[in-house]
Amino acid sequence: MVADVGYLAIMVAGLGAYWWQHLRTRPRISTVRELFTSDAEVALHVAVHEATTRRQPLSSLHLLYGLLQDEAVVAAIVTAGGNPDSVEDRVLTALAAPTDESDQADEAGRLTRRAAALGHHAGHQASCTDLWAALTGSPAARLLDDCKVDRGATLFALCHGGRAPEITLPDERDVFIVLRNDNYTTQEFVCSLLRDVFALPDAQASAVMLATHTTGRAVVGRFTATAARDKIQRARALARAQAFPLWIGVEPA
């Protein structure tokens, strides 16, 4: 689980501005390597090259184009039921259309700083997964929505390596509902979900959230199979609406 990354973005803003200022002319400087994994660096290089070739300010659409050249991102989109080739066609069409460049002022800088903040918070270099998560709220995210790409399911595949597990249980069984940690679902969202869907008191909701964050997993509680299916479906729907890669499933009681 991740806290509000706004303050973390401020922490890395100065460093982010430095590498962005130099990225266009020296894309392989050490500062970039300190902030981003090699795969993310390649995606950023592709994005910058595409923007430079078109004589456009770097935007979220260029970043998305760069991400679409990454095999793991493409595989995750497919896993989530999307068509990456169709998305790339839509991106190229959008980049070829006239745009108001004033609307794109520092857009890519904000997104890459957010990705760097996500990586910093998790204690690792920012990856293509962080860049994908950082697209939230951008024109690229809206294009993905228009293409019927499930951004949350794609992020889930990038984080957890596949689709959310099916919940097929005999009705007579009791099960434990379990949460697993990720670096993108916010702590505030998890606490709200535990209160609203599972009716946990504030203190217990915070305790379960913190246990998930610190140990990697936590048990929400014991439920009948029927109740577990209903609550997990509700929880996943809420997470999907905000494109969070929340892992919630069951274990035998």
Model segments located where?
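Histone-fold recognition with a strong bias for associated Lys/Arg-rich disordered tails
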Residues: 1-167
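Terminal domain-initiation and capping elements
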Residues: 167-253
